[in-house]
Amino acid sequence: MTKYEYVWLDGYQPEPFLRSKVKVTNDQTPPEWSFDGSSTLQADGGSSDCILTPVQEYTNPLFGDKLVMCGVQTGSREVHPSNTRHAASEVASDEWWFGFEQEYFLTNPDGTILGLEAGIPSKPQGDYFWG
């Protein structure tokens, strides 16, 4: 038995939320799975079936089960408008590289930035790159 936690973005705007649901199965790979899209703003109440299509599977570092990142399709198997992963895959290639930048400041006990003179206001963003 394998426990799969399906993870997808809902239809909330302007910023979607992460949604998930769990399926325990004997399948070796995560199967497609339907859900009620009316509760995630991805379908009207009259025709609310949506389909989760597995895109990538990862081992859950906390529990050892599987996390399944999913795209969303409508009940008629069209790409759902909230499925921005699909739109990105159409313009991206395997050649693309990207990175994330996280900035840190060392501070004095009083909260001022270490290395700046006391009483002098800090400069706008961008002038603190010391590496």
Spell out what each predicted region is.
Residues 1-131:
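Glycine-rich, acidic/polar active-site loops that bind/position phosphate-bearing ligands
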